[in-house]
Curated annotation (Swiss-Prot):
GO terms of molecular function: ATP binding; GTP binding
Sites where the protein binds GTP: D59, I60, R61, G62
Keyword match GTP-binding: yes
This protein's name: Nucleotide-binding protein Cthe_0113
Keyword Metal-binding recorded: no
Organism: Acetivibrio thermocellus (strain ATCC 27405 / DSM 1237 / JCM 9322 / NBRC 103400 / NCIMB 10682 / NRRL B-4536 / VPI 7372) (Clostridium thermocellum)
Residues annotated to bind ATP: G8, I9, S10, G11, A12, G13, K14, S15
NCBIfam families: PRK05416.1 (NF003828)
Protein family membership: Belongs to the RapZ-like family.
Domain of life of the source: Bacteria
């Protein structure tokens, strides 16, 4: 029997994950009191294979009952029952945005002090996070990307040895994306904005792309950038990191950063990674440029 404990920060996407797991044959129970884990596992083991994949969502909604989780997991281990822990998290800014959009109340912030509730929750969950088998940060994942990550982990034959890489082009005048692990400033490349024929085009247009890539310093930068990510990604994976967010910035986020991001996207797509790209500031009218 495969026993999975799902926990993590409120608002990080546990409900979505449960849906994806149910779709691939997991028997899921939401908000189970930790004291019942052992009993429930015994029942499943006695089902003669009818229940072979189980996912239990256990989080701070249980209040003080959550304190029983670690002792109960230790008891499972002592009784010879194997389990895995999936821990979901997201950045404070993303969690606050999700709560405001959903208008839901955080379990530890009934008075509305969201940031205080999130901070308290992180402290409570710190020990279980350290023992997690898998940690997924959903801050920069679309539902489709999150589903792909779940399938990669829990569907036999779907697991891959690469990394989920998100590339974000942006304009420094609009701020650096808070979710970035790495940020590269490409404002050293001559700016197509000042050439009339390219001023209102973007780095996705061939004329702009060819212009940006025509400089010797661009070619040297791309060589060094490729070498760096080829060095970093395997070492990140070795340390247990499964996602990487790379930011590429220029002044306005329409020309140079877009062209460089597209080039990096094409390069990484040829590797064993799942790569996504988002031109955050290419168009400020709200249209999505993610793929």
């Amino acid at each position: 029997m495969r026993l999975l404990i799902i926990t993590g920060i409120s608002g990080a996407g546990k409900s979505l994950v449960v849906k994806y797991l149910e779709d691939i044959g997991f028997f899921c129970v939401d908000n189970l009191p930790p004291l019942l884990i052992g009993k429930f596992a015994e029942i499943c083991l006695k089902s003669r294979g009818k229940i072979s994949k189980v996912a239990l969502v256990i989080d701070i909604r249980g209040g003080e009952l959550f304190n029983d989780l670690v002792p109960e997991l230790n008891a499972l281990k002592e009784s010879g029952i194997d389990y895995e822990i999936l821990f979901l998290e997201a950045s404070d800014q993303v969690l606050i945005k999700r709560y405001k959009e959903s208008r839901r109340i955080h379990p530890l912030a009934p008075e509305g002090r969201l940031i205080k509730g999130i901070k308290t929750e992180r402290e409570i969950l710190s020990q279980i996070r350290k023992n997690a088998t898998y940690i997924i940060d959903t801050s920069n994942l679309t539902p489709r990307q999150l589903k792909e990550e779940i399938l990669a982990i829990f569907v036999e034959g779907r697991k891959f040895d690469g990394m989920i890489v998100n590339i974000i082009s942006f304009g420094f005048k609009y701020g650096i994306p808070i979710e970035c692990d790495l940020v590269f400033d490409v404002r050293f490349i001559p700016n197509p904005y000042y050439i009339e024929s390219m001023k209102y085009k973007t780095g996705k247009d061939e004329e702009v792309r060819n212009y940006v890539m025509s400089f010797a310093e661009t070619a040297e930068f791309m060589t060094k950038l490729k070498d760096l990510v080829d060095f970093l990604i395997p070492n990140y994976i070795k340390e247990g990191k499964s996602q990487l967010v790379i930011g590429v910035g220029c002044t306005g986020g329409r020309h140079r950063s877009v062209a460089i991001s597209e080039a990096l996207f094409s390069y990484l797509c040829g590797r064993e990674h799942r790569v996504f790209i988002d031109h955050r500031d290419i168009d400020k009218d709200g249209r999505s440029n993610r793929r």
